[in-house]
């Protein structure tokens, strides 16, 4: 039965590789619970999908669009933070400069500030 169905579909989708992609996608839709547009006649989902394409109850163009939509992914691009953006653009950041001061130097500076030095 499937061989005859493939021969019937070649008129609607001339490229057999594309036909396989479309029929497989439609079979997955049927497995996911989509309504069948032809009588099942105890056939499995791939054969039903080929029969739908052959009978033109499923348009090849519509199937193609749904296949493309199903395979498209949206990639979110994270924007860098403002500080990182400034550094990437070559500007200096607004952060205070951190001074690596030893504990001894810090105590001396505090004592000098208080006038005990």
UniProtKB/Swiss-Prot annotation:
SUPFAM superfamilies to which the protein is assigned, alphabetical: RPB6/omega subunit-like
What the protein does comes down to: Promotes RNA polymerase assembly. Latches the N- and C-terminal regions of the beta' subunit thereby facilitating its interaction with the beta and alpha subunits.
Would you identify the family this protein belongs to, as annotated? Answer: Belongs to the RNA polymerase subunit omega family.
Q: Name one GO biological process term.
A: DNA-templated transcription
**Keywords for the protein's UniProt record, in alphabetical order:** DNA-directed RNA polymerase, Nucleotidyltransferase, Transcription, Transferase
Species per Swiss-Prot/TrEMBL record: Ruegeria pomeroyi (strain ATCC 700808 / DSM 15171 / DSS-3) (Silicibacter pomeroyi)
Entry superkingdom: Bacteria
Enzyme nomenclature, EC number: 2.7.7.6
- Protein name as annotated: DNA-directed RNA polymerase subunit omega
Cross-referenced InterPro entries, in alphabetical order?
DNA-dir_RNA_pol_omega, Pol_omega/Rpo6/RPB6, RPB6/omega-like_sf
Report the NCBIfam families cross-referenced here.
rpoZ
GO cellular component, alphabetical, reads:
DNA-directed RNA polymerase complex
Catalytic function, reaction form? RNA(n) + a ribonucleoside 5'-triphosphate = RNA(n+1) + diphosphate
